[in-house]
Amino acid sequence: MRIMLDLNILLDVVQRREPFYAASAEVLSHALETSNVACLPGHALTTLHYIVAKYADREQANTLVDWLLAHLEVVAQDRSQFVRARSLDIADFEDAALASAAEASGCELIITRNVADFQASPVPAFTPEEFLLASTAERAPEGAG
């Protein structure tokens, strides 16, 4: 399954933001340890680099970007995706751009802490907890539950 990670999930992990860190870190681990393909829109790399360089340092920001490039699929974004994003009834343009990238790259879902912001998304959005609960149910042996 292809899943698009919202920027807030990665920031939860990178900045160890409580009370969100545990669930977001588990989502990231799950995505890396299973056959899921974790995706990230290209525009998120520059945002993450900027935030980490500002609040930590440039070396840590570079290390993070290198790690993301090695472990996640970075989805290219072009003009047509941004035009599509503008056509979506999503108030925040960054969220609309992420939804458009998810749609164009064949992602089946978006993982975000702000599900309400993605109600008009062409790709359904789930919280980390919802995703983990569904993933656990899928891996449960028959007769479990």
Q: Language-model segments: which ranges?
A:
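Acidic, PIN/NYN-like endoribonuclease modules and their adjacent C-terminal/linker elements
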Residues: R2, H71, S100-G145
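Short, well-structured N-terminal submotif of metal-dependent ribonuclease cores
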Residues: M1-C39, A53-Q60, A120, L132-G145
